């Protein structure tokens, strides 16, 4: 699966879980778990509960995702 095949969503961080994993509440009302992308980890971008984030998910598993951007 190439990078272009990912689906992007926006949501709000509702809970912080261990190992830099977060529970995200999407705008549609669904809740998914997501981890931080490597580029965000490398640049020490902190994510807190209540932050608006953009996540990408594959079509194969719509319960897990990767946080790719933190909104200002």
UniProtKB/Swiss-Prot annotation:
One of its GO terms (molecular function) is rRNA binding. SUPFAM superfamilies: Nucleic acid-binding proteins. PROSITE patterns: S1_IF1_TYPE. Residues 1-72 form the S1-like domain. InterPro entries: NA-bd_OB-fold, RNA-binding_domain_S1_IF1, S1_domain, TIF_IF1. Keywords: Cytoplasm, Initiation factor, Protein biosynthesis, RNA-binding, rRNA-binding. GO terms for cellular component: cytosol. One of the essential components for the initiation of protein synthesis. Stabilizes the binding of IF-2 and IF-3 on the 30S subunit to which N-formylmethionyl-tRNA(fMet) subsequently binds. Helps modulate mRNA selection, yielding the 30S pre-initiation complex (PIC). Upon addition of the 50S ribosomal subunit IF-1, IF-2 and IF-3 are released leaving the mature 70S translation initiation complex. Component of the 30S ribosomal translation pre-initiation complex which assembles on the 30S ribosome in the order IF-2 and IF-3, IF-1 and N-formylmethionyl-tRNA(fMet); mRNA recruitment can occur at any time during PIC assembly. This is Translation initiation factor IF-1. It comes from Xylella fastidiosa (strain Temecula1 / ATCC 700964).
